[in-house]
Regions:
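N-terminal metal-binding scaffold of metallo-dependent hydrolase/deaminase domains
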Residues: 1-39, 45, 49-50, 403
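Active-site gating loops and adjacent loop-to-helix segments of metal-dependent hydrolytic enzymes
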Residues: 98-109, 163-190, 233-235, 239-245, ...
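Divalent metal-dependent hydrolysis catalytic cores, especially in the metallo-beta-lactamase
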Residues: 78, 94-126, 148-162, 189-203, ...
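Active-site core of metal-dependent hydrolases
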Residues: 187-309
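His/Asp/Glu-enriched, well-ordered alpha-helical/loop segment
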Residues: 261-271, 289-301, 307-393
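Active-site loop-to-helix "anion-binding N-cap" substructures in soluble metabolic enzymes
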Residues: 79-88, 109-119, 248-265
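Alpha-helical scaffold segments that flank or form the walls of functional sites
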Residues: 67, 75, 85-150, 172-189, ...
Length: 407
């Protein structure tokens, strides 16, 4: 496939007029407009046969000046279209993956809720089975199959969190950090769990837990009432990720900077942030980018099962949720309960309503999550040898085409 006449988002984080060549599910060339003819000639010369040469040119897309960016990667969301990852159902995961691909999210790492340990183990085992089945299906995938986002990990938001900052999590299932249980989670998921959230102030053994687990899984600060000092200690011990910055954590003030201040001070910490226009004021989004380098910010959707669905009553982690417009809240007390916005819309909102440069926003939804997940060598940028997951956006950032695995 040749994708021509597009503004290619390069690995250096800028847009350059040119094109992309894919073969199979892999990007094989990226060219500027000036080097177009030379690149195409070279590709034809290196093709092994006339059949390959014909395949190279039989599918040419005229991008008509569209932006060409990598497929988005959402490493923290719960569900969409009436389904939730924690339903523990492979067909639900498949439907979620199909919806995500349709909106431009080509790789997913869904999040768990705070549920009983045995139930979480079952959910993780189901996810591991789904992943293995997908690997077999991909070998016989045809052009008529629906596109699916690749399942690249799991983000465990609980159960080692704070009851004070539980948000829309069920307090009855919160437990202190426990290495044996954490290992059970990793084993049940066949090590698909990439992030394990904790509230360090809730466990006397938090620092030792982090030190003993950090080489097996990314430890994140999640739903935590930690002070600046406690959060700083956890990050210095090896925690390297912060779950939805500003939300479900200590407030950020000039005398008590809390988790936000600790994350800002630690150059190794990556922070998730929800840019749906509901969870955080635009001014605080801009402030976060000024406090931390853009390379450490990760856009997430935190979407729940009502995403893509009409207003009404739904559930999240066993709790009743009311959805009105773009806001999801617990029926019990009005607490925000995830979002009803997909990652593509969050990225667009960050640019059009919050003043984040497009080049920065794209990195926060592609490159940065890929780095955090440890998959940047295979996806997250438009680079030779990487997965051919590419989105075409018009000048209004409206999605025009999803190219998944080169098709």
């Amino acid at each position: 496939m040749i994708i021509d006449n597009v503004k290619v988002y390069t690995e250096s984080g800028e847009f350059v007029l040119g094109g992309i060549i894919t073969q199979g599910d892999t990007i094989t060339a990226v060219y500027t407009e000036k080097k177009k003819e030379v690149t195409l000639k070279k590709m034809n010369m290196t093709a092994d046969s006339s059949v390959q040469k014909e395949k190279l040119t039989e599918n040419v897309i005229d991008g008509k000046g569209a932006y060409a960016i990598p497929g988005l990667i959402d490493l923290h969301f719960h569900g969409c279209m009436g389904d939730d990852f924690c339903d523990g159902d492979k067909e639900a995961i498949r439907r979620i993956a199909e919806y995500e691909a349709s909106v431009g999210v080509t790789a997913i790492a869904p999040a768990t809720m705070t549920l009983p340990v045995e139930e979480l183990e079952s959910i993780l085992k189901t996810a591991a089975e789904y992943k293995k089945e997908c690997e077999n299906i991909n070998q016989i995938e045809t052009k008529n199959d629906k596109k699916r986002a690749d399942f690249v990990g799991i983000n465990m938001e609980g159960p080692f969190i704070s009851p004070i900052k539980k948000g829309a999590q069920d307090e009855r299932n919160i437990i202190p950090c426990n290495e044996e249980i954490a290992q059970r989670f990793l084993d049940a998921s066949d090590h698909l769990v990439k992030f394990l959230g904790i509230a360090p102030e809730e466990s006397a053994n938090a620092v030792s837990f982090i030190k003993n687990m950090k080489d097996k899984v990314n430890i994140s600060l999640a739903h935590t009432n930690a002070s600046y000092e406690t959060a700083k200690e956890a990050l210095e011990a090896g925690a390297n990720h912060v779950v939805h910055l500003f939300n479900a954590m200590t407030g950020f003030t000039h005398r008590e900077p809390g988790v936000v201040g600790a994350a800002s001070d630690n150059e190794h910490a990556m922070s998730e942030i929800i840019c749906d226009g509901v969870h955080i004021h635009p001014s605080m989004i801009r402030a976060a980018f000024k406090m931390m380098s853009a390379e450490r910010m990760i856009f997430i959707s935190d979407s729940m099962r009502a995403t893509g669905m009409p207003d009404g009553q739904y559930t999240l982690g066993g709790l009743d949720v009311k959805v009105t417009g773009n806001r999801a809240t617990l029926v019990s007390d009005g607490t925000l309960a995830g979002s009803v916005t997909n990652l593509a819309d969050c990225m667009r909102t960050a640019v059009t309503q919050m003043g984040i440069p497009l080049e920065t926003a794209v990195a926060c939804a592609t490159k940065n999550p890929a780095i955090s997940l440890g998959i940047y060598e295979e996806r997250g940028s438009i680079s030779i040898g990487k997965k051919a997951d590419i989105l075409l956006l018009d000048q209004n950032l409206t999605l025009k085409k999803v190219i998944k695995s080169g098709r």
